[in-house]
Amino acid sequence: MSRAPDTHSDFIPRHIGPSDEDQATMLAAIGAASLDALIDEVVPPRIRSRAPLALPAARSETDVLQDLKRMAARNQIYRNYIGQGYYGTHTPNVVLRNVLENPAWYTAYTPYQPEISQGRLEALLNYQTMVADLTGLDISNASLLDEGTAAAEAMTLARRGSRSSSPVFFVSQHCHPQTLEVVRTRAEGLGIELVIGDESRGLPECFGVLLQYPHSLGGVADYRELAQAAHAQGAVVACVTDLLALALIEPPGQWGADIAVGSAQRFGVPFGFGGPHAGFMSCRDAYKRNMPGRLVGVSKDAQGNPALRLALQTREQHIRREKATSNICTAQVLLAVMAGLYAVWHGPRGVRRIAERVQSLTGALRAALAGLGVKVANDTWFDTLLLETGVATPAILAAADCARINLRQVDGARLAVSLDETVTLADLQALVNVFAAGLGKDEVALPAPQASLDGIPAAVRRQGPILSHPVFSSVQSETDMLRYLRKLADKDLALDRTMIPLGSCTMKLNATAEMIPITWPEFALIHPFAPASQTPGYRELIDGLSAQLCEITGYDGISLQPNSGAQGEYAGLLAIRAYHQANGQPQRNVCLIPASAHGTNPASAQLAGMDVVVVASDANGNVDLADLRARIAQVGERLAALMITYPSTHGVFEEAVTEICDAVHEAGGQVYLDGANMNAMVGVAQPGKFGSDVSHLNLHKTFCIPHGGGGPGVGPVAVRAHLAPYLPGVLDAQGRLDPEAKVGPVSAAPYGSAGILPIPYVYIALMGAEGLRRATEVAILNANYIAARLRDHYPVLYAGRNGRVAHECILDVRPLKETSGISAEDIAKRLMDYGFHAPTMSFPVAGTLMVEPTESEGLAELERFIEAMIAIRAEIAQIESGERDRDDNVLRNAPHTAQMLLAEEWHHDYPRQQAAYPVASLRENKYWPPVARVDNAYGDRNLVCACLPVEAYA
């Protein structure tokens, strides 16, 4: 019997792990009278919010999804020929169902622990191999945020690698408009002089060149001589390119490019109104140590078997800080995995066949339009035609609108059309009919497409094979693909298997109801530069989510454009810099940053053109107020901002936060409060109301966008009213910035990774004000419960007043190194034998473990983790007492693979049973790490960042 839809929310107790009874048990165990009393003990009274958030009450999953379906239906799905870096594509259903919609893939964390990440590392290595192969360059990274930011990163890489002393970077006018705008924003912050022009007229003296290959408006140029001329003056040559086109045109590496960047979007990832999509970068070997982003490399494990891991990590912001190659932290791993698997699914013949078909259909369209008297401006092409439509332009656009077709309007007299793999002959005939109607002519039949490469000059046609590694020819059927994906997923630990207690990462539940809408066509199939009249549903979503986030944070304005937390930091600092400049204080360019801050903070400040001055921490892990005042006095009128993480990276609410904000404001500076730890404040404190001027939020932490193995993320930047005019500029439908905008864009799409904004929207709607506050309270309860239960076994390094922590705690394992020889890394690897992902290692304090359980983990899982940590402490005690060998023990040899434990001979100073099943529950449900401990140093000394030959795994 059917029943009426229930509008009451039962989601809150499904999102929050501990039941009411369990919460009561935990509160009693830590000596707190109630959740409210615990929050009073943890959160400073001066910042504690007592009034409930002005948000609607929690709603049911059915109600929220129906409402979102109504919102999505307001968007209009047109046939898109806009191109401009975004193209229609068919996501292979086997990838859609088994990767994008599979929590084994989307709930994983960045693969910093390689032994439990071999599946997604292999998928990323496929992606890197694909990019390096198609671009003809030596090495590729594991993804960047989008094409525009990849181009900006190419500019900074060129500056680091150039022999020229020139401050000029030349950018071709043939680049996509949005790329020009993002590069311009980056150049202004770094003091780089940008020259935009037509490269065919010669190059100025410059340190680097950025070309588009093929051109944004269709042409395919031969850049060999230009590259030689650039190299002759010491300049580095970068190009923005298209992976599908590279199946047919000469790889950039062969004609002289040093760096290639672009978007892998058209390899199986939908528009999503602009993202998320994986940007790519490849380069010559000489630039590898300066290349931004993560890099998957091949190494070996302790048994001598091939093993994958993240290579050359000393380049990254979490180690190099303001000297890092980039501020990038989160990238676009899930989307890079999908793009790499698209190549595996289609194989070299399939990818080339798709490219040939697109090029052939473009040629047929060109012939049909010529028959109508339309002048095609470009003599060369892959998928794009530039059409001189003159006074007929408005009529053609009107006819296109009637046919629900989007064309790219270049200006008042020119249109452009880009084809993709989804275009059918019927689509093409409808497109030709639109032009006939707009021109007032009779319809003409589309000529039969010809299997030729007439649009590509012979000099730049690709001669060699593509995707030559056997992995791209290994899949012959969907059965093969399904089993390959299962094999990869089984190698990894994600939230679908176990708690991931990573401090500063907030690995909470990514509920199925939150994920469902992202693949709805009304959200997934919208081009980022579609006319505003076609996207009212997205506008409602963006405006609604923006208002909710402003209410939650206490800020007045927000931009959802930044597509990572690091980009949000960058955008916030650009706003501060522009604000000071508008006030006639351009000298304010010093950013104060506590020594304990996450590495993205100083890296972002450097990108925004600021000098970094470090502020010391006191013995309790708080900002040293005396040192802060001394640094403020030291920099004087140069003070631009203070960046502070709150609660602190040490896992405590600093009591003096309002005093810190006041000191900065009195000196004329602005306060940037890093919102990475917002999961400890939602509903209990609002940074915009206790002294902060700007924050970024990590929607992939606090608001349930999954980490995806290292991306996607969304990092909105929220500001008080006086900074609102300086939020990132929003591009128009042509990808251009309003001349009145005070700050440029930080992402290529107007609203960043808009395609995943339904996730936080659904989360907030399902939780309501009360549920959001309760989630914060339970996150704090869970952290304090773990701290209390483990305090007798491992010292908790920092605590606030009343001995409480915030939403995470730092376990100090440093003394164990002296008493037993056991390090934080050894404990992390041993936890894998217990079926756990390790806590955060050595941040913010070297040699420690930082644990963040989140509100989504129930008491049973917390107890399982506590049991494992106590058992490991007992194993360490055996070493301390001399019962077990100091060098040959279960921790130093961890993790243990099945292959190790099934070896014919066993010579270790402990039994196999202890290695495999240290607690009884593992006999029922055991995760086996696929490789033993990975040798990181070997991998960096012998750098290989592409797929190994098959025989290497024999």
Swiss-Prot record:
Species this chain originates from: Bordetella bronchiseptica (strain ATCC BAA-588 / NCTC 13252 / RB50)
Family statement: Belongs to the GcvP family.
GO term, biological process aspect, one: glycine decarboxylation via glycine cleavage system
Catalysis: reaction(s): N(6)-[(R)-lipoyl]-L-lysyl-[glycine-cleavage complex H protein] + glycine + H(+) = N(6)-[(R)-S(8)-aminomethyldihydrolipoyl]-L-lysyl-[glycine-cleavage complex H protein] + CO2
Entry-linked Pfam families: GcvP2_C, GDC-P
Protein encoded by which gene: gcvP
Protein name: Glycine dehydrogenase (decarboxylating)
Molecular function (Gene Ontology), one example: glycine binding
Enzyme class: oxidoreductase
